[in-house]
């Protein structure tokens, strides 16, 4: 079964592994959905409320650091 976590009011997201780091700064009113799927993938969907969605998919063994 897939697991979904809905997070709101997040100021920044960093996705870190051994080789690279993604740093995302969504709009202050944006919505972030973190979904861990049963097939071993993870999806971060960021909706900036201005019809500009940024979707990032990465292996499940990455670390996700969410700061506010």
UniProtKB/Swiss-Prot annotation:
Superkingdom classification of source: Viruses
Family: Belongs to the chordopoxvirinae A37 protein family.
Protein name (Swiss-Prot/TrEMBL): Protein A37 homolog
Taxonomic path: Viruses, Varidnaviria, Bamfordvirae, Nucleocytoviricota, Pokkesviricetes
């Amino acid at each position: 079964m897939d697991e979904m976590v809905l997070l709101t009011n997040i100021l920044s997201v960093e996705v870190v592994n051994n080789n690279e780091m993604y740093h995302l700064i969504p709009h202050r009113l944006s919505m972030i959905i973190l979904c861990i799927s049963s097939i071993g993938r993870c999806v971060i969907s960021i909706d900036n409320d201005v019809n500009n969605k940024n979707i990032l998919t990465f292996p499940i063994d990455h670390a996700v650091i969410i700061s506010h």
